[in-house]
Every structure is written in structure tokens, then in C-alpha cells.
Amino acid sequence: MKRSAFFISDGTGITAETLGQSLLAQFENITFNKFTRPYIDSVEKARAMVQQINNAADKDDVRPIIFDTIVNQDIREILATSNGFMIDIFSTFLAPLEQELSSHSSYSVGKSHSIGHNSNYMERIEAVNFALDNDDGARTHYYDKADIILVGVSRCGKTPTCLYMAMQFGIRAANYPLTEDDMERLQLPAALKQHREKLFGLTIDPDRLTAIRHERKPNSRYSSYAQCEFEVREVESLFRRENIAHINSTHFSVEEISAKVLVEKGVERRFK
């Protein structure tokens, strides 16, 4: 079964898309064609949006699902004339919250993502720069400033996880790829030993690792199943021997991996 889903906002669309994606993910038996439409901030754009929604309804022969975070009442009323099932995120959550807090919300566009009013902005940038500068074991002499150091075989998800933690939570995360030489020594590399308390391991199913590496270096020893299986087995053995907490990243999203890492290591988010 297929349905169209629209994430519509008069701002960036981040809130509508994030919440909408989370809700739609609960319906695994349905395939959704997803469309993000940010900055629908005028009557003309709203009318054009209605036409897009109606076209999707005609094509699918079923009304689309619409997640919106539109602040302007006139624009919301225009969207409501479309042949779609609307979920107005702001009105759904703000109305009961206003009642509980005995206060009216500001209904401001892009409030949570404003750079000018976000005291965490520079800290976020610094964390991202740290993750980039300390990616792939590039600069181990800065590990004393890291909150977390992810370790694991090449292409198991270390870099995207570090960047996500930096962007979302201001975590200074470094990562170090364990190589075949490290495995042959049967011990942690010298650069990691003095930061053992910051280490967290990522592992991955060999067949998934093979597929990922094949996209980068097809038909190579690096991407062969035998090599991937060997590296994963040896690294998992190293994690157990050195008592390093670790998880298998195969079936988890970057968001889930990040949350598990922070909980396991007891690291507090710099901002929430």
C-alpha cells in the first residue's frame, strides 16, 4: 500500500518533517512518498501547495497525509481546503499546553531554530568542527578534549554518529578506526590506552559491512566478506577483552546509536 505524505511549514520544515517521519515509521506495512515543503509563507504559495496535494490525491486515489507547522491562520485555512488528511502539529500540542501553563504561546515562525536567540549556536559549531578535525583517527593528540571516542572497524557508522552527536547535543566526539595491524597486536593502540574511560565501540554485521564497503571499493580485499568477517570478529574480541562497552550498529539509526552511546557512557548533552 502506498500513500503520499507532505511535511509543510512556513519555516524550515524541520519540526514537521522530524515528527512526521517518526509517526509514519510506526506503519511499516505502508510505503510513503514523502515531500518536504518549507517556507510556505504566502497565500500564493499555499494555493499552489493545495494543487500539489490534490494532484497527489488524484494520482494515488487516496488522500495524502499532511503534517504542518504553519503559524499563519490564513495560510492554514487555505491548506485545509485541500483533499488531504491534515495533522496540525502546533494546534494539536500548543492548545493543551497553553491551558496547562495558563499562558498563550507566541506562535513564532522558526522559534526553536533561530541563530540569533540560540546561545548554544557557537558551541554546536565548535563540536562539529571537533568531530571533523578528529575524524578517522586523524589527530589523536586532541583526545583529552573529547567527551567520547568511538572505535570500530572502518565504515561501521562512527563518523555519522559523531557528527550527529555534535550537531544535536554539542558533544565533542572523536573516532578511531581499528586496523588489521591493531588486531594483530591483540591490544588497544597506544593513542587510545590513556583515554580508555572515553571509549565506546561500534560493531556491525559482516554482510552489511561488505555491502557498504563494496560501494566504496568494489571487488577488493577490503570489501570482501572474508575480510569483513575477520575484522568484525577480531574487533568484537578486542572489545570483550578490554571490557569496552559496544553495540551492533546494523539495525539502528544514527539517532538511536547516539542515544545509546550517551546513556551507556553517562555523558550529559551540552544542550537539549
Curated annotation (Swiss-Prot):
Give me the reactions it catalyses. Answer: [pyruvate, water dikinase] + ADP = [pyruvate, water dikinase]-phosphate + AMP + H(+); [pyruvate, water dikinase]-phosphate + phosphate + H(+) = [pyruvate, water dikinase] + diphosphate
Keyword entries, A-Z: Kinase, Nucleotide-binding, Serine/threonine-protein kinase, Transferase
Listed EC numbers = 2.7.11.33, 2.7.4.28
InterPro entries, per the entry: Kinase-pyrophosphorylase, PSRP
Tell me which residues bind ADP: 152-159
**Per the UniProt record, which residue ranges are transmembrane?**
none
Q: Name one Pfam family in it.
A: Kinase-PPPase
Any one GO MF annotation of this record? protein serine/threonine kinase activity
Family to which the UniProt record says this protein belongs: Belongs to the pyruvate, phosphate/water dikinase regulatory protein family. PSRP subfamily.
The free-text function statement in the UniProt record for this protein reads: Bifunctional serine/threonine kinase and phosphorylase involved in the regulation of the phosphoenolpyruvate synthase (PEPS) by catalyzing its phosphorylation/dephosphorylation.
Q: Which PANTHER family match?
A: PYRUVATE, PHOSPHATE DIKINASE REGULATORY PROTEIN 1, CHLOROPLASTIC (PTHR31756:SF3)
Query: HAMAP family from the entry?
Result: PSRP
Q: What is this protein called?
A: Putative phosphoenolpyruvate synthase regulatory protein
Q: What taxonomic classification does the UniProt entry list for its organism?
A: Bacteria, Pseudomonadati, Pseudomonadota, Gammaproteobacteria, Pseudomonadales
